[in-house]
């Protein structure tokens, strides 16, 4: 575990910055659209493109891990992230916003965000510690919003939204050394199959995943998760501004979500090592939908918004260690990044619907009422189905193997 600690710290820092910046982009929705004379739906197109690019490229990045290793993908993703923020800060219209916030940051997230970070953490630690460590890494991933949200709001208020985005680019540059250090996980050899047979191919792993009812249901429910979270991350600042709340309340709410996400991620990482991960997922989706309904059913207040943010934060990214751990239990480590990427692609299609659909419904109806009601209804359905069909832990795909990470002498020179 001592040898893995620098890797875990580095991947936690990288994930924290990547997710913190991404979850705080909604702070710039109102000033950016006013300055560039864009509709809300135009900005949400960029966020929707980001989520689709992220989702479509996630399984590709996961598959390339077995060919190139983690380091080139992590470092390349960090560089793409910084480039995307610079393009966004210099944007003069919709095209620049879509290329910067959409295409470049979407590509970057496929290589720097949760799915890749949790695959690195899974590779770095033994199976007995995996669920708790995944919770810790997920928790670290939420800390970036505690810094990014207030920083972005302060810079936007004092010097304009372009200064806020450029501040994000400077903060994002810290991902580059973190990504390089996290790439040391390439030195850790994969578990050795005890039967001496060759490992399964990518095609066999994918076929097994799509035949597994538990995996298919989990991926479908993940769609709803993405729809709910990105709707909130993108549209909550706009909703509060429309209701006449102080602009800083949006940043405070995002920071509270991030802070309580630390507690929630640690809890669900711990709980996933003791109870059915899929049952916990269903309970999480159901609870999140109830909290969403309770908040949007009444006019917002500062105190109510912060309480909502705390509750939602506890339930925010606890899905990460549960889904990642479920994939390892079902299919093992070798193709974890790719198969988890398939599930995450479903999440990102939901994110596309949440970001774009929320903006379209607002432009058509002048309110978010129908959008949040759809989010609550689909979330309750996903949670109940996930609990109804929760399966016991299956054995990993293929014969048993040693799960303890070990340094591969052939890779020690990296």
Tell me the role of every PLM-derived stretch.
Residues 25-29, 212-265:
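Extracytoplasmic gate region of multi-pass secondary transporters
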Residues 32, 111-125, 318-331:
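Intracellular juxtamembrane helix-capping segments at the cytosolic ends
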Residues 56-95:
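Conserved MFS/SLC helix-loop-helix module at the cytosolic interface between two early adjacent transmembrane helices
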Residues 57-70, 265-277, 363:
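Helix-to-loop junctions at the C-terminal end of transmembrane segments
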Residues 96-112, 304-318:
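Hydrophobic core of transmembrane alpha-helices in multi-pass small-molecule transporters
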Residues 101-139:
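Cytoplasmic helix-loop-helix junction between adjacent transmembrane helices
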Residues 137-187:
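Helix-loop-helix hairpin linking two adjacent transmembrane segments in secondary transporters
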Residues 257-261, 267, 275-326:
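C-terminal transmembrane helical hairpin of 12-TM major facilitator-type secondary transporters
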């Amino acid at each position: 575990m001592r040898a893995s600690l620098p890797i875990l710290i580095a991947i936690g820092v990288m994930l924290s910055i990547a997710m913190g910046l991404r979850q705080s982009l909604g702070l710039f929705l109102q000033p950016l659209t006013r300055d560039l004379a864009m509709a809300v739906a135009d900005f949400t197109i960029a966020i929707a493109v980001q989520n689709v690019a992220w989702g479509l490229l996630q399984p590709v990045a996961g598959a390339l891990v077995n060919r190139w290793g983690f380091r080139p993908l992590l470092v390349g993703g960090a560089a793409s992230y910084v480039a995307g923020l610079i393009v966004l800060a210099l944007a003069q219209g919709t095209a620049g916003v879509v290329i910067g916030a959409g295409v470049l940051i979407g590509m970057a997230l496929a290589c720097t965000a949760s799915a890749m970070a949790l695959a690195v953490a899974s590779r770095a630690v033994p199976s007995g510690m995996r669920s708790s460590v995944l919770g810790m890494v997920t928790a670290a991933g939420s800390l970036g919003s505690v810094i990014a949200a207030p920083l972005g709001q302060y810079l936007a208020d004092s010097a304009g939204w372009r200064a806020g985005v450029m501040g994000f680019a400077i903060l994002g540059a810290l991902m580059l050394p973190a990504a390089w250090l996290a790439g040391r996980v390439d030195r850790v050899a994969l578990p050795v199959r005890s039967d001496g047979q060759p490992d399964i191919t990518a095609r066999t792993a994918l076929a097994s995943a799509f035949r597994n009812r538990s995996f298919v249901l989990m991926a479908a429910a993940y769609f709803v998760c993405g729809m709910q979270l990105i709707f909130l991350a993108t549209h909550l600042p706009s909703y509060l501004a429309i209701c006449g709340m102080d602009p800083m309340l949006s940043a405070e709410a995002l920071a509270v979500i991030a802070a309580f996400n630390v507690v929630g991620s640690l809890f669900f990482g711990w709980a996933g090592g003791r109870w059915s991960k899929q049952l916990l997922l269903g309970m999480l989706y159901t609870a999140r939908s109830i909290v969403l309904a309770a908040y949007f059913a009444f006019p917002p207040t500062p105190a109510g918004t912060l309480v909502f943010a705390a509750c939602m934060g506890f339930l925010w990214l606890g899905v990460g260690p549960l889904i990642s751990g479920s994939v390892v239990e079902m299919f093992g480590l070798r193709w974890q990044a790719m198969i988890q990427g398939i599930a995450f692609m479903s999440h990102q299609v939901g994110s596309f619907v949440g970001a774009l659909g929320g903006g379209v419904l607002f432009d058509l109806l002048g309110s978010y009422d129908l959008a949040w009601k759809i989010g609550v209804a689909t979330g309750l359905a996903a949670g109940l189905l996930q609990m109804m069909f929760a399966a016991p832990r299956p054995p990993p795909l293929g014969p048993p193997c040693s799960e303890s990470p070990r340094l591969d002498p052939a890779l020690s020179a990296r």
